[in-house]
Amino acid sequence: MAYFNYNRRKSSVAQIGDTPMGGENPIRIQSMANVSTMDTEAAVAQAIRMIEAGAEYVRFTAQGEREARNLGEIRKQLNEQGYTTPLVADIHFNPRAADAAAGEVEKVRINPGNYVDKVKTFSHLEYTDEEYAAEIEKIRERFVPFLNICKAHGTAIRIGVNHGSLSDRIMSRYGDTPEGMVASCMEFLRICREENFPDVVISIKASNTVVMVRTVRLLVRTMEAENMHYPLHLGVTEAGDGEDGRIKSAVGIGTLLCDGIGDTIRVSLSEDPEAEMPVARKLVDYIRERENHRPIEASMAPGFDTVATSRRISRVVEGIGGTFSPVVISDRSSGDFEFDYLSLPDYIYIGKEDPDNLPDNFRLLVDAHFWKERPNAFPCFIASEAEELKDYDCPLKFIRLTYMDLTDRMLEILKADKTVVVLLSTHHRNGVGSQRAAMHKLLMAGCDVPVVLHRDFRETDVELLQLKSAADFGTLLLDGFGDGLMLHNEGCEAVVSDRCMFGILQATRTRISKTEYISCPSCGRTLYDLQTTIARIKEATSHLKGLKIGIMGCIVNGPGEMADADYGYVGAGRGQISLYKGKECVLKNIPEEDAVERLVQLIKENGDWVN
């Protein structure tokens, strides 16, 4: 992986219709329809909207052979209107539907968790090695005929592993782990290689960004060990909608793109599918800006493992560092003192002097030469002022540094002064690589100074600010780096930056400040109005800080993706909902119009409600 210097991973090419993926091809953008696959007119119309919004592949669900066959009619009508963008069939539980779809569309996605193995029941199964090998042979017996159909029609496949739909067989041997997800994928990849089938794309997805990133990195490492280089499809499942969905997607997808990993992406939003393409395009374009950047000379700290990261050990300075949650520092040097009480920062930076309208009860960062001793104000230095740190008698001092400032003398100062916190900035085009280099230099020097990650942007587009800051900060946080965040942006109100920082910390699971919603983007299997339902559930429960609520269109990934959710709302049929407490379905087939109220009642009955 390209850890310090950005380079795309060298993948093999999968031929998908007339739009190949991998190799030197651009990172492709795709999405999935949410209308019924049997509603041909609606499906064609939505596909056209997605294509015109930038989709390079369009996916439809195919629950059975009937839906799979109808994809041929959708393909035909799109061709007649001049749209040749490859179509993809999404298959769960039904290998016969995969066989049928292989003759109708350019690519078929199968899920190893439910292609041959029995439906997930969360049961623990015991296998001898011989019995386990026999189960894999069953996969081969069913999978090879499907590959032969694909060969005959020039159809590509995606082996799409979801965290939420690992089989009981895999779960029993590996547990709910990255190793289990990778093992599930590799069973199918080895058969593809043995059968000389090259047009394969892989995805390993999860709603938990930590799990998703670690697992994809482990998959790449495992494939390299077996000399496999298949292209990768990236996505965060059940990312949600609005700001949360964009930030969570950018954290997971952006981190891997920063590593040089990924040949196609889907930003899974609980919104209309055509809304996903502009978001995905902005994210890809931002990462590509660092191509051919000035090289960063750096070394990785011995023992650091990108697959098994943990938070860097830092000393504690006035509640910053150690095991304390990362702090949020808001740059208010512009004089903007409007705040959102749901995202109040821990500190504010005011720059050179105290403005007249300075709010009370905030801890302040003040430029060192303008600092006056008082209980809630702390001096902020720049690199050239480092020798002056010892002249200031206060319990907390900040110093703004870049990677290039970390000289031997600077490291001596940082080690000696136990009251200092670093604001780690970057001016490099590959800011992530530069800040990674700085963190590894601190590790190798044995310097445990707390580090607040700092970035500057000039964005008037709020969505672009969310994507850029989430990709950059998220990458470092998932590496285990960062005792806080400081985001300065010229172009939007400061409160927008504050919300971004709290959203990024939530998405990386480093600091929980609000309710977390694990909501799917919906597809043709969803039989209720997902977007309206999400809005109603959020309105009723958004004050329940730290609670995780899953909102799923159907049972395909629902119970599994909600495995670490406290409560779940899952479509059970047309107009019917099932409610979950953890993994257990506690209320079945509730009328949709009553389901949100019953969810609130369930939360209250279990003692998790606050007024």
Curated annotation (Swiss-Prot):
PANTHER family: 4-HYDROXY-3-METHYLBUT-2-EN-1-YL DIPHOSPHATE SYNTHASE, 4-HYDROXY-3-METHYLBUT-2-EN-1-YL DIPHOSPHATE SYNTHASE (FERREDOXIN), CHLOROPLASTIC
Required co-factors: [4Fe-4S] cluster
Domain of life: Bacteria
Pathway terms, separated by semicolons: Isoprenoid biosynthesis; isopentenyl diphosphate biosynthesis via DXP pathway; isopentenyl diphosphate from 1-deoxy-D-xylulose 5-phosphate: step 5/6
Protein name, per record: 4-hydroxy-3-methylbut-2-en-1-yl diphosphate synthase (flavodoxin)
Function of the protein: Converts 2C-methyl-D-erythritol 2,4-cyclodiphosphate (ME-2,4cPP) into 1-hydroxy-2-methyl-2-(E)-butenyl 4-diphosphate.
Record keywords: 4Fe-4S, Iron, Iron-sulfur, Isoprene biosynthesis, Metal-binding, Oxidoreductase
Cofactor binding notes: Binds 1 [4Fe-4S] cluster.
Enzyme category, top tier: oxidoreductase
InterPro entries tied to this protein: Dihydropteroate_synth-like_sf, IspG_atypical, IspG_bac-typ, NO2/SO3_Rdtase_4Fe4S_sf
Pfam (any one): GcpE
A biological-process GO annotation: terpenoid biosynthetic process
Underlying gene: ispG
NCBIfam families listed in its UniProt record: ispG_gcpE, PRK02048.1
E.C. no: 1.17.7.3
Binding residue positions for [4Fe-4S] cluster: C520, C523, C554, E561
Substrates-to-products reaction catalysed: (2E)-4-hydroxy-3-methylbut-2-enyl diphosphate + oxidized [flavodoxin] + H2O + 2 H(+) = 2-C-methyl-D-erythritol 2,4-cyclic diphosphate + reduced [flavodoxin]
Gene Ontology MF: a single term: 4-hydroxy-3-methylbut-2-enyl-diphosphate synthase activity (flavodoxin)
Assigned protein family: Belongs to the IspG family.
